[in-house]
């Protein structure tokens, strides 16, 4: 039943919903494990040492390696929903809640920096590759200390991406269904890719190699979580016997429904009732 989604998303690198209750005013409260800080706060206070960059990236990919085969996509990964405690344990929060939030409220700006280009170019079905893009942006920010693609708005967002990656490849342009978007992309100045080594002079060859595979313009060419976690850069942490994969797909189709918020409350409530029986 609907209880699937939360019940089966139990993983060390994902925040578990420990308890949920609905107040008399029918607000939904998610009581989650509390972790010390988030990556956004951590990055704004000081540059990260290399071993932390590595370990944090590993844990993010470990979470995605688990959920992606189940057909679950976060869609809104950014440093502020990556929680970290004093032992450097990392957990991703807000899985499956991205659609519940009102875009006006979520501080669209911070989110935009981490949005995959295909979301802006097509607005149609997109898949787990969008999470890999977001984690690639977060990886770059951990290396460099500042956001890699700080777009001021939708249009500027694509411009800053092309300034580093060069013009979108043909196979990406061919997926664009909207004529307006197509015209916009055709009007962008033709750009060559800038070598990542030039943009990130302090990064190691292994870091650069993995980063380029994660920030591929074409979602179909972009590396998967399962492949990224096996990259030599993450060898110190990679342990196939300790990287579980969700063993069944579950249906979050209700998550795509465009429902008024009061209906969401009822739905979430039923989901939670079912979940709490386990």
UniProtKB/Swiss-Prot annotation:
The keyword Transcription applies. The keyword Transcription applies. InterPro entries: Kinase-like_dom_sf (IPR011009), MAP_kinase (IPR050117), MAPK_p38-like (IPR008352), Prot_kinase_dom (IPR000719), Ser/Thr_kinase_AS (IPR008271). Keywords: Activator, ATP-binding, Cytoplasm, Kinase, Nucleotide-binding, Nucleus, Phosphoprotein, Serine/threonine-protein kinase, Transcription, Transcription regulation, Transferase. Its main location: cytoplasm. Gene3D superfamilies: Phosphorylase Kinase, domain 1, Transferase(Phosphotransferase) domain 1. Activated by tyrosine and threonine phosphorylation. Its EC number is 2.7.11.24. Dually phosphorylated on Thr-106 and Tyr-108, which activates the enzyme. A motif (TXY) lies at residues 106-108. It is an enzyme of class 2 (transferase). The modification Phosphothreonine is found at residue 106. The modification Phosphotyrosine is found at residue 108. GO terms for molecular function: ATP binding; MAP kinase activity; protein serine kinase activity. Its cofactor is Mg(2+). Belongs to the protein kinase superfamily. Ser/Thr protein kinase family. MAP kinase subfamily. HOG1 sub-subfamily. This is Mitogen-activated protein kinase HOG1. It comes from Wallemia sebi. The gene is HOG1.
């Amino acid at each position: 039943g609907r209880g699937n989604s939360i019940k089966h998303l139990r993983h060390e690198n994902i925040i578990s919903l420990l308890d949920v209750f609905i107040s008399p005013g029918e607000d939904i409260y998610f009581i989650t494990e509390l972790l010390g800080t988030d990556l956004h706060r951590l990055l704004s206070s000081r540059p990260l040492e290399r071993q932390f960059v590595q370990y944090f990236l590993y844990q993010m990919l470990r979470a995605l390696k688990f959920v992606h085969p189940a057909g679950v996509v976060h869609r809104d990964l950014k440093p502020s929903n990556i929680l970290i405690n004093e032992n450097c344990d990392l957990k991703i929060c807000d899985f499956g809640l991205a659609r519940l939030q009102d875009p006006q409220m979520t501080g669209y700006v911070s989110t935009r920096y981490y949005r995959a280009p295909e979301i802006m170019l097509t607005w149609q079905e997109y898949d787990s590759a969008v999470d890999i893009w977001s984690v690639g942006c977060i990886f770059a920010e951990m290396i460099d200390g500042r956001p890699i693609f700080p777009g001021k708005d939708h249009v500027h967002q694509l411009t800053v991406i092309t300034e580093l990656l060069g013009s979108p490849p043909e196979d990406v342009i061919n997926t664009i269904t909207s004529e307006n978007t197509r015209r916009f992309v055709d009007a962008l100045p033709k750009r060559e890719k800038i070598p990542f080594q030039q943009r990130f002079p302090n990064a190691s060859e292994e870091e650069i190699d993995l980063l380029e595979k994660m920030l591929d313009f074409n979602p179909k060419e972009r590396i998967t979580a399962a492949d990224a976690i096996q990259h030599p850069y993450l060898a110190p942490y990679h342990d196939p016997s300790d990287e579980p994969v969700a063993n069944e797909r579950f249906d979050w189709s209700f998550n795509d429904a465009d429902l008024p918020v009061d209906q969401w409350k009822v739905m979430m409530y039923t989901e939670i009732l079912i979940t709490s029986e386990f």
